[in-house]
Amino acid sequence: MQTYLVGGAVRDYLLGLPVKDRDWVVVGADAQTMLAQGFQPVGKDFPVFLHPKTHEEYALARTERKTAKGYAGFSFHADKDVTLEQDLMRRDLTINAMAQDADGKIIDPFGGQRDLAAGILRHVSPAFAEDPVRILRAARFAARYGFEIAEETIKLMRQMVENGEADALVAERVWQELAKGLMEKNPRKMIEMLRECGALQVLLPEVDALFGVPQRADYHPEIDSGIHTLMTLQRAADMGLSLPERYAALLHDLGKAKTPPDILPRHHGHDINGVEPVREVNQRLRAPRQCAELAELVCRWHIIFHQVGQLKSQTILNVLKKTDAFRRPERFQTALNVCIADTQGRLNREHTPYPQRAHWLALLEAANQADSGKIAAECRAQGKAHFIAEQIDRARLAQIAPLQKAFRGA
């Protein structure tokens, strides 16, 4: 019985990165051997055990065989006769198919160290094509490390998409990988790689449809709506924004793909036109509520947020109410963060100031100075409870108006 550190722990060690989770593979053992040594079985689908002291995962070396479409269509064979190299061969990428023995020696039968040094993501074997999740994983690793995907691997990924493997992906797995990719250092790279292999058209056709749609050069020197979306997403990442904010950045301009060709490169109403596509993506991916709600909010209101200097006080109050800013100020603030990414996610506009954010927050704070509780009590005391909402609005407008006048005159 021999144990080896495998996968991501070896990869990150060689990259000089912190090793977060350590996974082990056991060669020359079976389930009875593991149980006899005090290991606790935890794997439902595979023979995986927890170490009795460290509680790290130890898996028996295994081989896999494709039995049906999709990521779950596999059977496996785990026994004492399965070698380390056979176990490593079933893994997705060469950089993930390395092991380290107890003496610190690296076992690298497929050139993972070479590809790490070159910044290349390359599939280990044709078996890569048996699991469609690997399309997403390869794109996600590109986003994490900034690596390029080998041309032969991109070609294989294209074939997988053409063969319908991406169609077999369930929403939960797509969201899981997408969410991880969005939180990587370079999420733009993930979307680019998915587009290059054709998977974006299958998984996020609403985003894919943005590429090639022109915008006004005076507002968007990058011209292409898809490129702007990538730049906005990357700016959100560079700002250190949260997953809901990055997801909203990815979907904020879906309405531009709905613009009638005869009015291009203008996009009147793309904020409103984008709401339905955003909802469709949310439903298809089963996006978490916080992500889904923020994406829809940003899509619908980002143009109004940008144009605050042109708005009347009554319109501002209406926006604050419709966006639920009084009850959910934190969400309102995150929406404005995405608007910064939208403004700066343009060619040579990375450092464009965005005073609108501070002004919107100041307007909200001013409107909150109106004592709604006191107003409600006074109305009830006068037998005019039906005037409560109207009186609160008047008090809020009285706070908003001078602030807005000063901002517009600045």
Curated annotation (Swiss-Prot):
Entry's EC annotation: 2.7.7.72, 3.1.3.-, 3.1.4.-
Miscellaneous note of the record: A single active site specifically recognizes both ATP and CTP and is responsible for their addition.
Residues binding CTP, per UniProt: 8, 11, 91, 137, 140
Xref: Pfam families: HD, PolyA_pol, PolyA_pol_RNAbd
Assembly description: Monomer. Can also form homodimers and oligomers.
Sequence similarity: Belongs to the tRNA nucleotidyltransferase/poly(A) polymerase family. Bacterial CCA-adding enzyme type 1 subfamily.
Superkingdom to which the source organism belongs: Bacteria
Family matches, as PANTHER family: MULTIFUNCTIONAL CCA PROTEIN
Name this protein carries in UniProt: Multifunctional CCA protein
Gene from which the chain derives: cca
Residues given in the record as Mg(2+) binding sites: 21, 23
